[in-house]
Amino acid sequence: PSITFKFMVLASPSAEYITSDYVKVHIQREYARACPGGTGRAKTGGNYAGSLKASMEANKLGFHQTLWLDTLHKESIEELSGMNFFAVLDGVVHTPKLTETILDGITRRCLIKIAQNLGYEIKESHMKISELLKQIEDKSCTECFMCGTASIIVPIAELCETDGTSYSLTYSKGQVAKQLRETLLGIQEGRLEDTEAWVTTLL
């Protein structure tokens, strides 16, 4: 590997990452995105490369994103191909606890802080996919959403298996997600007070 490098910052406008009003997510039970001992927690190009095959297959089946499970047991929810995962269970906001295979996303951090400031209880834990699907069916899980720099927050309408089994969320367009999104955008755009000193003014 090279012993020198050049640090560059590119600023460019971008279109919306996901434009659909009804987002369907494929539960990936075959492939693995990141393995223990690797670079799964880092923001590297290689992590995206590992998800491309599954993402292309999911797109062909009509899905917008892929939900990845842990590599070893395919039981614990990790993240989506380019975004972190959240779910609202009985009014409590849940997100997978960070591991060496889950990205410590900056948008994830911001949303946790915003949710706490808005009075929501936050739980970071190892979320089992089997338990979540049961909670969606019994309506104790009312919404799921994903977040990232490009997309900010995207509500999930359905979680789907390869065999066609689908699990529809009560709030397919988000409720808590909408509140968190509007708050974060308000801070970014200067309409709401930036109490966390997240925004830097460039002159």
Language model: regions and residue ranges:
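Helix-start/capping segments and mature chain N-termini
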Residues: 1-203
